[in-house]
């Protein structure tokens, strides 16, 4: 079984985000965990597609995107398009869990 150190971008200093991601890559980190929060499904708001798209241009790490949002199936393709390599959703957040899983599988990324 493979194990991966997967630091969370949520703990980054956003004033130095690019530099910190570069440091992680230089240290051999292969995966980056990205918590996307919408302020509805969870009380906090983090960031979304523009941030992921921006860091994807600068990073070859595996992006493990955790959608902590209401009705995540509405956004799956958008997150795939901006660079997610893996998407995790909460079953209770989905309006249609089967559809969410189908969309992730059809995108050929990891669930």
Residue ranges and their predicted role:
Residues 1-77, 81-82, 88, 94-96:
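Conserved N-terminal beta1-alpha1 strand-loop-helix module at the mouth
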Residues 97-102:
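Extended, positively charged loop/linker patches that create polyanion-binding surfaces
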Residues 105:
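Anion (oxyanion) recognition and catalysis
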């Amino acid at each position: 079984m493979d194990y991966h150190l997967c630091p969370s971008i949520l703990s980054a200093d956003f004033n130095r985000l690019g530099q910190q991601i570069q440091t992680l890559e230089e240290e051999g980190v292969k995966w980056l965990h990205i918590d996307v929060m919408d302020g509805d499904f969870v009380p906090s708001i983090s960031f979304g597609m523009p941030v992921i798209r921006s860091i994807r241009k600068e990073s070859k790490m595996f992006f493990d995107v955790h959608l902590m949002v209401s009705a995540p199936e509405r956004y799956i393709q958008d997150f795939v398009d901006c660079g997610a390599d893996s998407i995790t959703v909460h079953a209770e957040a989905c309006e249609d869990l089967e559809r969410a899983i189908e969309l992730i599988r059809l995108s050929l990324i990891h669930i």
